[in-house]
């Protein structure tokens, strides 16, 4: 019997070490078992990486993190090259260990009290007009990090009064009342929380999360601020069916969600959940049509769509795929 991993505070656990801690064990995928990527999943990298390196340097200088880098997003080059990034607050170590996600797991250090000001100054220096703020899960904090979100929103608006802010929040498991009291008092311009996948696969895909809890979080924020768009996203290719995805879309509409993102799951490493299927662009278009027929005000559906991919265009209602 192998010895349990003793986690040291502030140490990042990734890949095999992270997967060893999940309740539903995942067998590492052998190379010959990997699904071959279809042509539509090929990414063309930009010829000039000057802007990309500039954003990375600004992040390092101010001790900030982007979910683009920490989660190995396939759109990093495109977004950084256009001068956009999704900032990840509350550190780069998550208290959850979802087997689809490349963000490190572990025992995080205390939040940086200066992060809101550093974040606000960086955003002002970059002259951003739309920003997405997300975070790792912080189950170690009494409010799940909600006050830190609020402090960041306040600091950003002080330095950039005309900016639009989208928050992509965790589920605040076990502390929804406390978190919503804080978040509804300092609301963003778009409130986003991802369901990620279908309820049948939740124990496998999102261990520690609850499908109905996440729906309730979205619903309760919408009840407090009916004028603010609520948004959620799902990955496809983890073993779900298109019919199950459409059923989740119905659940989201029933809970007041008005914006949707659907994108292809990509396996970060052989230790993560394997890709079960690649969904074609035509299928994404069909699901988008279903979403719009249900009453979503905007639906971004496509192989490379991620929750914050061209989030500014999504908020304006422009087509993203």
From Swiss-Prot:
For this protein, the Enzyme Commission number is: 2.8.1.8
The record describes how the cofactor is bound as: Binds 2 [4Fe-4S] clusters per subunit. One cluster is coordinated with 3 cysteines and an exchangeable S-adenosyl-L-methionine.
Pathway terms, separated by semicolons:
Protein modification; protein lipoylation via endogenous pathway; protein N(6)-(lipoyl)lysine from octanoyl-[acyl-carrier-protein]: step 2/2
Where does the record say this protein resides? Cytoplasm
Task: Give the primary localization class.
Answer: cytoplasm
Radical SAM core domain location: 80-297
InterPro entries reported for this sequence: Aldolase_TIM (IPR013785), Elp3/MiaA/NifB-like_rSAM (IPR006638), LIAS_N (IPR031691), Lipoyl_synth (IPR003698), rSAM (IPR007197)
Q: Which cofactor does it need?
A: [4Fe-4S] cluster
Q: Where is the signal peptide?
A: none
Query: Which class of enzymes does this protein belong to?
Result: transferase
As one GO molecular function, the record gives: metal ion binding
Residues reported in the UniProt entry to bind [4Fe-4S] cluster 1: 68, 73, 79, 308
Q: Which reaction does it catalyse?
A: [[Fe-S] cluster scaffold protein carrying a second [4Fe-4S](2+) cluster] + N(6)-octanoyl-L-lysyl-[protein] + 2 oxidized [2Fe-2S]-[ferredoxin] + 2 S-adenosyl-L-methionine + 4 H(+) = [[Fe-S] cluster scaffold protein] + N(6)-[(R)-dihydrolipoyl]-L-lysyl-[protein] + 4 Fe(3+) + 2 hydrogen sulfide + 2 5'-deoxyadenosine + 2 L-methionine + 2 reduced [2Fe-2S]-[ferredoxin]
Family annotation (CDD domains): Radical_SAM
Query: What are the binding positions for [4Fe-4S] cluster 2 in this chain?
Result: 94, 98, 101
Q: PANTHER family this protein is in? A: LIPOYL SYNTHASE (PTHR10949), LIPOYL SYNTHASE, MITOCHONDRIAL (PTHR10949:SF0)
Which family is this sequence assigned to? Belongs to the radical SAM superfamily. Lipoyl synthase family.
Under the heading NCBIfam families, the entry gives:
lipA, PRK05481.1, PRK12928.1
- Name of the protein: Lipoyl synthase
Organism of origin is: Cronobacter sakazakii (strain ATCC BAA-894)
